[in-house]
């Protein structure tokens, strides 16, 4: 046996290992082999087996023979502790029941088995021989091990089982493989990193950081206590975060990304379908909530959700606290706190697109923009509390679905459309039910009948085909209209143009202001004009001679003034002169008649001639 110099530090290590081991009562003896170069083994049953420049200190400390043909022994290996093995060149193992496997590997720590054992079943053993390969084969036993080129294992029961693997922490595991007898075959986990008690990084380039964190996919990363990344390129960050889809990302406590390419960001956020993006606390992608009406159910593929407690179906977008995209359509977008979309676009706090009377069960192509706006069935609502196809309560919540609203448009605060193909524009402008194709424009305007038009502040058109244009006009007669400031038309087929007019007659027309027309079929022209029923004039007697007039049975009259407020009728064309003519006669025609009358009669006698006009006296004497 060759002599070898034992430094004070080496003696301290030897003494410490001896005193801390189960064999503290056994004297420590150091030896060198006769065939090795500067190798040293100290302790009961320790052995360097011909290793070169190697050191084995402790009970059952073991450096095996070289397994490469032509190689003398393991070079520059160090094994310190009870039941330890350094089986690779330049490897280092420190602790009880620890193992290093390949070149440059490091294992520091020990197992947690109670009692004193000698076993070749202590975890993973590369090549045991001689006295080190006998005794009990234990079950449920885990040794500290660094098996792989450049592997590093630090901590009790820590294991680094592949090339470049790093495990730090009690029972941490980096890499995986299979054991055939006393030979370990690494299958995965190259360059893997596991840091934290009971953490595990089992696939190539995987990283697990945190207590019981788990990275089991290639290039996967799990950071946080109980975090898990279980698919290739998955990332889970946060306590109990879970990323199980390929390329999925889960960030936040209890977050989960189960779909491929899914993103869940926020505490308890979940993206459970492929391509889903959910951002915010408790954000979730959901199945089609209206699948019961025949739409295909799905699990939120390509859904996007951003905000606390958001919900998004497949292809939907939900952004904002409590926002929800219910239907799996590309046009399903809900943006804003509490926004809800069942197939269209809802933007604004509490904005919603909901199913109305549409048999398909969706509100596809609907748009709702503004706080508490509501749209049902292919409508458009713009403005706070604007609504189409559904009425609202006083506090702005949906009340009931109306009989109409398809293709309706409401623009303005509190505007509403409750009939098909109708339009309401302005604050509190409304088109009520049973008023298809109606129009209401202006503050407090209202159209409540088919094809009705109300334009102006407070304008109201309440009968079919009516027109009310101007402030405060009220038109309730079918096919009637009013243009101007507050006028009222209740007659059928009647029109008022002007201000402050009242027409209760049917088929009547007023052009002027402050006119009250109650005469059917009449026409009133001018400010403050009045009208009364027409009086028939069948004929007239002159000097006892009766004359009958044409047009002696009028159905109504035209008024252009009032008593004391008469008006001339100017620029009247010459009317026809005949026994049956009903044309108006202008001044020139009357002038022609009077001119002839004023010429008088020419009389001739034996004494001469003379002229007498109508009404003049002519005296005739006998000769």
Predicted regions and their residues:
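Primarily extracellular Gram-negative trimeric autotransporter adhesin
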Residues: 1-623
